[in-house]
């Protein structure tokens, strides 16, 4: 379901905030985007499945202590919504940088958000690298 321009802009803003804060190693800033619910979910390439704000926060705190930095650029972004629930799919490239080298590979990220009290919040984030044979 296509959405109105205001909702599309708000959901794309969530994506951009998530990515820029993650790349900046701003764990608290990333957490501000999530709903304060016990059943939020984040799936990353490093961890099988993170459930709840405690697991997501612990993962982010570990991430900021490590030498690897992740960043993303998006070639395509699609946004849909129905009422107070919105979702998006972004397709592009993930950068994985360490002190001595950087890798780039195809990446996809999807998000499910809910609007509460006039603010869009993350409920689920799923990131994955497609495998090509």
Identify the role of each PLM range.
Residues 1-36:
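Short, low-complexity N-terminal intrinsically disordered segments enriched in polar/charged residues
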Residues 14, 27-83:
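A solvent-exposed, acidic/Ser-Thr-rich amphipathic alpha-helical stretch
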Residues 34, 92-94, 126-129:
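Short beta-strand segments enriched in hydrophobic/aromatic residues
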Residues 60, 74-79, 92-94, 108-114:
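Hydrophobic/aromatic beta-strand elements that line small-molecule binding cavities or substrate pockets
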Residues 70-71, 84, 88, 105-107:
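Residue-level preference for beta-strand/loop junctions
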Residues 95-103:
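Short, cysteine-centered beta-strand-loop-beta hairpins and adjacent loop/turn segments enriched
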Residues 106-133:
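Short beta-strand edge/turn micro-motifs at domain boundaries
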């Amino acid at each position: 379901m296509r959405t109105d321009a205001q909702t599309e802009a708000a959901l794309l803003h969530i994506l951009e905030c998530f990515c820029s804060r993650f790349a900046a190693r701003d764990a608290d800033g990333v957490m501000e985007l999530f709903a304060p619910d016990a059943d939020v979910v984040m799936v990353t390439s490093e961890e099988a499945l993170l459930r709840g704000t405690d697991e997501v926060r612990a993962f982010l705190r570990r991430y900021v202590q490590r030498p690897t930095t992740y960043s993303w650029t998006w070639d395509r972004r699609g946004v849909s919504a129905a009422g107070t629930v919105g979702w998006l799919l972004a397709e592009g490239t993930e950068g994985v940088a360490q002190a001595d080298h950087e890798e780039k590979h195809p990446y996809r990220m999807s998000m499910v958000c809910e609007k509460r009290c006039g603010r869009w919040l993350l409920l689920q984030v799923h990131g994955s690298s497609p495998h090509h044979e």
